[in-house]
Amino acid sequence: MEITKKPKIKSIPYDEFIDNESLEKLVKELNTGGANVFLGVLDDLVNWGRSNSLWPLTFATSCCGIEFMALGAARYDMARFGFEVARASPRQADMIMVCGTITNKMAPVLKRLYDQMPDPKYVVAVGGCAVSGGPFKKSYHVLNGVDKILPVDVYIPGCPPRPEAFYYGMMQLQRKVKIEKFFGGTNRKEKKPEFMK
């Protein structure tokens, strides 16, 4: 029995991440869309390097941080994917992994850490608490999702998510980085935090 249809990869949350064929087609369109061929090839090279050497800054406040530590163990080797260089300083990090509940008092600190990161920077919301507030959603002092103050690039659901879910989310971020236009701007949107309005 032969399988004729390729498996589709679920998107998180962008529709252009349907499968590898559409991603390759999008990259070809970007390279042939009247842009400089040299810059297109240079974009591919730079984005390949950036996507395979993402340095995370972990902002862990609950059980998702414990699951993130399992990624560095021998069973789940982060070095295979280029995430092994976890940073303690936001000035040396490419992405921030928000793992856990964010309270209203903690939100300005998280925003300050995000602002200290160099561009291009990425945000990964890990676990139910960071994605939507989790079991503390109705509480008066909990932020209902990190996307209220930061532009989230990838959501990793779960309470806590398994290490495989971490890797799936990180690979989605790698795919997003690979199709960005490094020379001539990135496809970013900035958010104004609710507590600063």
UniProtKB/Swiss-Prot annotation:
> What does the protein in this record do?
NDH-1 shuttles electrons from NADH, via FMN and iron-sulfur (Fe-S) centers, to quinones in the respiratory chain. The immediate electron acceptor for the enzyme in this species is believed to be a menaquinone. Couples the redox reaction to proton translocation (for every two electrons transferred, four hydrogen ions are translocated across the cytoplasmic membrane), and thus conserves the redox energy in a proton gradient.
Query: What GO terms fall under cellular component here?
Result: plasma membrane; respiratory chain complex I
The note describing how and how many cofactors are bound reads: Binds 1 [4Fe-4S] cluster.
Q: Where does the source fall among the domains of life?
A: Bacteria
**Is Translocase found in the keyword set?**
yes
This protein's name: NADH-quinone oxidoreductase subunit B
- GO terms classed as biological process: aerobic respiration; electron transport coupled proton transport
Its quaternary organisation is: NDH-1 is composed of 14 different subunits. Subunits NuoB, C, D, E, F, and G constitute the peripheral sector of the complex.
**Required cofactor(s):** [4Fe-4S] cluster
- Where does the protein end up? Cell inner membrane
The scientific name of the source species is Bacteroides thetaiotaomicron (strain ATCC 29148 / DSM 2079 / JCM 5827 / CCUG 10774 / NCTC 10582 / VPI-5482 / E50)
Q: Name one Pfam family in it.
A: Oxidored_q6
Q: Where does [4Fe-4S] cluster bind?
A: C63, C64, C129, C159
Write down the InterPro entries for this protein, in alphabetical order.
Answer: NADH_UbQ_OxRdtase-like_20kDa, NADH_UQ_OxRdtase_20Kd_su
Membrane disposition:
Peripheral membrane protein
Swiss-Prot/TrEMBL keywords: 4Fe-4S, Cell inner membrane, Cell membrane, Iron, Iron-sulfur, Membrane, Metal-binding, NAD, Quinone, Translocase, Transport
Q: Does the keyword Membrane apply?
A: yes
Membership in a protein family: Belongs to the complex I 20 kDa subunit family.
The main enzyme category here is: translocase
Q: What is its EC number?
A: 7.1.1.-
Q: Which reaction does it catalyse?
A: a quinone + NADH + 5 H(+)(in) = a quinol + NAD(+) + 4 H(+)(out)
What is a GO molecular function of this protein? Answer: iron ion binding
